[in-house]
Amino acid sequence: MTRIVIAGPRGNMGQEAVKLCLREESFELVAVVDSKNDGKQLKGLQEFQQGDVPVYTDMARCFAEHEPDVLIDLTAPAFGRKHMEVAFEHGVRPVVGTTGFSDEDIRDLTKLAEAKELGAIIAPNFAIGAILMMKFAQTAARYMNDVEIIEQHHDRKLDAPSGTAVKTAQLIAEVRAPKKQGHEQEREEMAGARGADFDGMKIHSVRLPGRVAHQEVLFGGVGQTLSIRHDSLNRESFMPGVKLAVEQVVKLSTLVYGLENLID
């Protein structure tokens, strides 16, 4: 039985993670960490009808009193690194779904994980289909090096481009030499019209109500194009990946960035 604490239970992703932990026989949800509602029970919150699970606002106190195995952090980019550091201090393995980590953050957190001999997972996207999309895009980039990424999310998302888009670009860059795309004399008549630049690739971010999480990787070649697309239609689509991450993190002794590293 894996003892779990969820940070950010009232968010859309957090609510799905709570349902996952309550229905999985091998998971035990021992507490949740929220920005408010300290001392209440989960089932007493507006978003939930069940769950005899205590609510904390102090993560360190929560860990000290319940000694969980795993933290599932689904809060906001501003809190991800701090929550991971608190988890390491208490011997807890973090599974983090927030984005916005810099390369320096990843390096520092990897050192902390290895010093504590604890597993940790940061997942820009938990959807298995999205992970496959990234892996397929990396394979395609070996043969077609003209590529642009279009990602679409709901209009409440704080960061742009998305962590999934950045991770996709990073994977492509591993097999593709930097290349400036478009005409050599190309100019933007409006700033930002061509999107963000990553090694010459362009990343375009769309934010609209009614969207959840969508990404298309577009490749162009002589006389042909290739499109690789993934759509998450609801947040339940992320839960198989969350389950996989929780099951795998207890077997690790370092930080893994991206679920693609856990899928053969």
From Swiss-Prot:
It is found in: Cytoplasm. It catalyses: (S)-2,3,4,5-tetrahydrodipicolinate + NAD(+) + H2O = (2S,4S)-4-hydroxy-2,3,4,5-tetrahydrodipicolinate + NADH + H(+); (S)-2,3,4,5-tetrahydrodipicolinate + NADP(+) + H2O = (2S,4S)-4-hydroxy-2,3,4,5-tetrahydrodipicolinate + NADPH + H(+). It comes from the Bacteria. Keywords: Amino-acid biosynthesis, Cytoplasm, Diaminopimelate biosynthesis, Lysine biosynthesis, NAD, NADP, Oxidoreductase. It is an enzyme of class 1 (oxidoreductase). Catalyzes the conversion of 4-hydroxy-tetrahydrodipicolinate (HTPA) to tetrahydrodipicolinate. This is 4-hydroxy-tetrahydrodipicolinate reductase. It comes from Shouchella clausii (strain KSM-K16) (Alkalihalobacillus clausii). The lineage of its organism: Bacteria, Bacillati, Bacillota, Bacilli, Bacillales. The gene is dapB.
